[in-house]
């Protein structure tokens, strides 16, 4: 886990920890969006291991189009880091232009890997059954980590 300078201290008892490993991105994001709108604080770990279904080249081209769509100074801005991609996907499922949506978005944390505070508190992360990859009928998918590298992000520690 990479600790970023902007990482604020977290009280583990206030946060529900969800593991994104082998979870379909859109399904997981919709569950998380509903729960943070209800007032729950959620930390999603291992976001680089979440998957997007479809063929790798198609997914890469779609994301490159999104990134290159706007003006570099004015936006829209699309992230390349897996944790920020996850947050952006959840943001798209919230009423972002309302106070309620922005307040809900503040209750979401996304991490690459497992943060130190989760390991120290010995928290068992929750898995979202509706989002599990085992429900897929095909093997066409790409992980968020792979997509990020294709978009130009360099994963720390060579993950």
Swiss-Prot record:
<keyword id="KW-0689">Ribosomal protein</keyword>
<dbReference type="GO" id="GO:0022625">
    <property type="term" value="C:cytosolic large ribosomal subunit"/>
</dbReference>
<dbReference type="Pfam" id="PF00572">
    <property type="entry name" value="Ribosomal_L13"/>
</dbReference>
<dbReference type="InterPro" id="IPR023563">
    <property type="entry name" value="Ribosomal_uL13_CS"/>
</dbReference>
<dbReference type="GO" id="GO:0003729">
    <property type="term" value="F:mRNA binding"/>
</dbReference>
<protein>
    <recommendedName>
        <fullName>Large ribosomal subunit protein uL13</fullName>
    </recommendedName>
</protein>
<dbReference type="GO" id="GO:0003735">
    <property type="term" value="F:structural constituent of ribosome"/>
</dbReference>
<keyword id="KW-0687">Ribonucleoprotein</keyword>
<dbReference type="InterPro" id="IPR005823">
    <property type="entry name" value="Ribosomal_uL13_bac-type"/>
</dbReference>
<dbReference type="InterPro" id="IPR005822">
    <property type="entry name" value="Ribosomal_uL13"/>
</dbReference>
<dbReference type="InterPro" id="IPR036899">
    <property type="entry name" value="Ribosomal_uL13_sf"/>
</dbReference>
<comment type="function">
    <text>This protein is one of the early assembly proteins of the 50S ribosomal subunit, although it is not seen to bind rRNA by itself. It is important during the early stages of 50S assembly.</text>
</comment>
<dbReference type="GO" id="GO:0006412">
    <property type="term" value="P:translation"/>
</dbReference>
<dbReference type="InterPro" id="IPR005755">
    <property type="entry name" value="Ribosomal_uL13_euk/arc"/>
</dbReference>
<comment type="subunit">
    <text>Part of the 50S ribosomal subunit.</text>
</comment>
<comment type="similarity">
    <text>Belongs to the universal ribosomal protein uL13 family.</text>
</comment>
<dbReference type="GO" id="GO:0017148">
    <property type="term" value="P:negative regulation of translation"/>
</dbReference>
